Amino acid sequence: MTQRPERPSEQDGFFWKTKTLEQMSSSEWESLCDGCARCCLEKLEDEDTGDIYFTHVSCRLLDAGLCACKDYANRSEQVSDCVRLTPDNVRTLNWLPPSCGYRLVAEGRDLYWWHPLISGDPNTVHEAGVSVRGRVRGTEDEIPDSELEDHIAQWPVRLPKRAQLKKPPRS
């Protein structure tokens, strides 16, 4: 009797299910980013409650159409308060959106259907309505800090219904 070939695990190829954040290669780490660019929005913190409020205002380096940094390699030199995500800080940053791939994996949760690692398509994050595309009203250079309260946005802390589905909606 010949031995049956081992059935491949459903987790084969899903490195985020089998590795800790610290075990990931730099390319695996970078690929956890879904490209929503919500982390590139200006945020306000309520001094009394600690609540975080996202705004419609982006970092000056964000290309709001592409949802990508215009100078990713040098972002920390260009923007002094740019936060580089690491395995340590993604576990403690309270402003990462609930849909953030880094946050989900750090919490032991799976990625959504629209994440490019699941869908194979970098546009599904936009199609699901999760990204900042079409929602940025200006950059930090264009809108003064004194006006940020006028630009508070509710959507970054919620997922659109279609993004919450287990699989993509039928067209």
Swiss-Prot record:
<dbReference type="InterPro" id="IPR008228">
    <property type="entry name" value="UCP006173"/>
</dbReference>
<dbReference type="InterPro" id="IPR005358">
    <property type="entry name" value="Puta_zinc/iron-chelating_dom"/>
</dbReference>
<dbReference type="Pfam" id="PF03692">
    <property type="entry name" value="CxxCxxCC"/>
</dbReference>
<comment type="similarity">
    <text>Belongs to the UPF0260 family.</text>
</comment>
<protein>
    <recommendedName>
        <fullName>UPF0260 protein Nham_1404</fullName>
    </recommendedName>
</protein>
